[in-house]
Amino acid sequence: MIPRVLILLTLVALFCACSTLAAVAHIEVDCIPPFTVYLLYGFVTLILICSLVTVVIAFIQFIDWVCVRIAYLRHHPQYRDRTIADLLRIL
């Protein structure tokens, strides 16, 4: 079973990115002063970069989790420790 934290982290990052883009899509730039527009687009860029980095980190953690699971399950059954498997949430 995939750890819930990875799924939750990915969903939160994607929600932040999508909600930011949806909010910016409805802004009329003609009614706002130029500095405010640049500041707003700067914040949008920052949020999107942070969301992208969060998704990449969650993906790397998922790959690491899969590799640990494969390495653990390759061991001979007599060397498998149930407490380690519970700790890593492998079985």
Curated annotation (Swiss-Prot):
It comes from the Viruses. Residues 1-4, 61-91 are cytoplasmic. The chain crosses the membrane at residues 5-25, 35-60. One of its GO terms (cellular component) is host cell membrane. Residues 1-22 form a propeptide. The signal peptide is only cleaved partially by host signal peptidase. This results in two forms of the protein, one uncleaved with two transmembrane regions, and one cleaved with one transmembrane region. Signal peptide: none annotated. Prevents infected cell apoptosis induced by the host immune system. Acts by down-regulating a number of cell surface receptors in the tumor necrosis factor (TNF) receptor superfamily, namely FAS, TNFRSF10A/TRAIL receptor 1, and TNFRSF10B/TRAIL receptor 2. Down-regulation of these death receptors protects adenovirus-infected cells from apoptosis induced by the death receptor ligands Fas ligand and TRAIL. RID complex also down-regulates certain tyrosine kinase cell surface receptors, especially the epidermal growth factor receptor (EGFR). Homodimer with only one chain cleaved by signal peptidase. Interacts with E3 RID-beta and E3 CR1-alpha. Belongs to the adenoviridae E3-RID-alpha family. This is Pre-early 3 receptor internalization and degradation alpha protein. The lineage of its organism: Viruses, Varidnaviria, Bamfordvirae, Preplasmiviricota, Tectiliviricetes.
